[in-house]
């Protein structure tokens, strides 16, 4: 991003600090950052009070304007500025920091649009989604970088779709963890958060639905209903025994009346259940033979968005796909990798109604749809 530097008599051009990063713009006027501590390695707050007073009295506004002009407007280094202003090089950083404190220099940031609106419009129109956020990612971004970017810029979008006092069902996932962590804090939202899936294993980690449910409830001043069961049990009889418990049954029923669900969309290729030792490669082959293309909350579904008929189906304790379809707003969150088949099937089956996705994934989804 380019810095635009302004003074009272001239518009500041592109400049930086000794080869400064081009991420901010500065102007020689008062502003909200006038009292912020200097980012150039020095701040007056680190000095004793007497030194601060002396320093402020020692430099005139005229000196500060000259130093700021030479440094920010003309792009001179601190050594050259020191010669012009007749001070030591070490004093230049003090001059520049004081210029900010007195309001002679102000920092502003040029607006950045993190979302790809054309792709959003196309996805919404072609796939019939209620709302879409396509987040731009830098070329060559790693999986972790894509997750971080989608979460950072997707969090406000997700928050806008969840009204105060709503019931929110939430699944687990790596991208979901980052997104929940970055949700704007609002203690007055008072949502009821419902864990949409039991714990994957005995080692409850930061990406599991329980931890994310608790984090969301804490950020939004809400209450939490936990599904205190394993996500996967040995057989249908064990599942039914858990669901027969009043405490578990109450949470299960509350899932049915959720206003919003926030879910990740998995594939057989990157299944967290294999990583956690719940499923084997052989299990995935069997699911693939039964037509599985995607997974939400441990529920594997086919190209039509219908749950695959397999022994696995009766071993899962999580929100059912039929329950999910009845929730008014289901937001799918995806970052990195081509999950087009899984996403398209989820949309076709009415499993998700809105989508947060990275730019590359959005393009792949449109190409998959056209083919």
Task: Go through the PLM ranges and name each one.
Residues 132-134, 193, 224-226:
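Conserved beta-strand scaffold positions in the cores of enzyme catalytic domains, especially
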Residues 170-175:
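Glycine-rich beta-strand-to-loop/alpha-helix junction loops that act as flexible
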